[in-house]
């Protein structure tokens, strides 16, 4: 019996410009993914087939720059990073609900040579300068081992996002994994509308630590307007069209995944570790706990 099915279906969202700001269309992308899952699982012979989404992106054309398509501005800053974490988590929940063997998704990004810096193309670096979305993939790459259960009081219900996107309260959610002597937690604050907003105070509790562990080292990485974000540094420099050697080095450094604080020792009390930090809109935090 053949155990491989090639079923081609692009799953994409529809970002727009609303009242002068970018609004993402995550709902459309999720509806397309759900429908694709339903089609595959409607055939008994394919129901248990592993599924990889061959193209899963926020919109359908990587080559649209902000010059003619201002909605592409989301690609330059941390919004694309937050969207990436949000959509992957939502896809995983859809797969769980539909009893689908979801194995991964491909994000299509390209290189666009001889183009202005931060022109809004769907690319991971711009002229060799890493964009925030690449740091989102770096964070996701740190998640390995056994997945842990997560409960978030700030999460928007998955069925609500499927119906209307993230248009009311932001979705403040997390993914956590564990391997030997390490727990890694990715937390994000996502909203479809890229507008200024008050940061969310995150109170994070990790329970079930091994009884013998009394102290841990915590590393806290961050993507926001001021961390792991070369776009902000480029704007601080006056948006140079031809950066000097010194400016280019500064852009390279600002494009790397950065820590919010220096590594810290944290005590374990009663098998728990507690954290409290402000998480801006369209921002991500990665906490790596080792012992």
Show which residues each predicted segment covers.
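Noncatalytic carbohydrate-binding groove/subsite architecture in carbohydrate-active enzymes
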Residues: 1-103, 112, 116, 156-163
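Conserved, mostly hydrophobic/aromatic
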Residues: 55, 91, 105, 137, ...
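Active-site proximal loops enriched in glycine and acidic residues that flank catalytic Cys/His/Asp
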Residues: 55, 109, 152, 187-189, ...
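Substrate-binding clefts and catalytic carboxylate motifs of secreted carbohydrate-active enzymes
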Residues: 65-81, 86-109, 210-253, 260
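Glycan-recognition and catalytic regions of carbohydrate-active enzymes
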Residues: 98-104, 108, 113-114, 120-182, ...
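Generic recognition of long tandem-repeat/solenoid scaffolds
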Residues: 159, 185-187, 273-277
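Carbohydrate-binding surface patches
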Residues: 162-214, 220-238, 281-285
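C-terminal beta-strand-rich structural cap/linker in extracellular carbohydrate-active enzymes
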Residues: 242-291
């Amino acid at each position: 019996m053949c155990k491989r099915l090639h079923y081609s279906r692009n799953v994409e969202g529809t970002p727009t410009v609303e009242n002068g700001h970018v609004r993402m269309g995550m709902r459309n992308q999720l509806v397309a993914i759900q429908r694709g899952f339903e089609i595959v699982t409607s055939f008994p012979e394919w129901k248990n087939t592993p599924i990889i989404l061959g193209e899963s992106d926020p919109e359908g054309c990587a080559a649209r720059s902000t010059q003619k398509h201002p909605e592409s501005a989301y690609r330059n800053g941390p919004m694309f990073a937050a969207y990436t974490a949000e959509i992957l988590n939502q896809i995983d929940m859809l797969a769980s609900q539909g009893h689908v063997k979801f194995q991964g998704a491909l994000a299509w990004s390209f290189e666009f040579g001889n183009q202005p810096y931060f022109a809004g193309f769907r690319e991971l670096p711009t002229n060799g300068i890493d964009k925030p979305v690449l740091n989102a993939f770096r964070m996701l790459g740190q998640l390995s081992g056994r997945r842990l259960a997560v409960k978030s009081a700030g999460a928007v219900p998955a069925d609500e996002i499927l119906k209307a996107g993230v248009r009311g309260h932001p979705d403040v959610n997390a993914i956590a994994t564990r391997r030997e002597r390490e727990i890694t937690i990715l937390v994000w604050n996502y909203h479809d509308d890229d507008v200024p907003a008050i940061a969310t105070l995150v109170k994070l509790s990790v329970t079930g630590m091994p009884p013998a562990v009394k102290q841990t080292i915590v590393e806290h990485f961050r993507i926001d307007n001021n961390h792991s974000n070369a776009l902000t540094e480029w704007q601080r420099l006056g948006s140079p069209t031809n950066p000097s050697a010194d400016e280019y080095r500064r852009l390279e450094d600002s494009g790397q995944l950065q820590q919010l604080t220096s590594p810290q020792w944290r005590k374990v009390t009663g098998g728990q570790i507690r954290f409290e930090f402000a998480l801006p809109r369209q921002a991500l935090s990665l906490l790596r706990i080792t012992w």
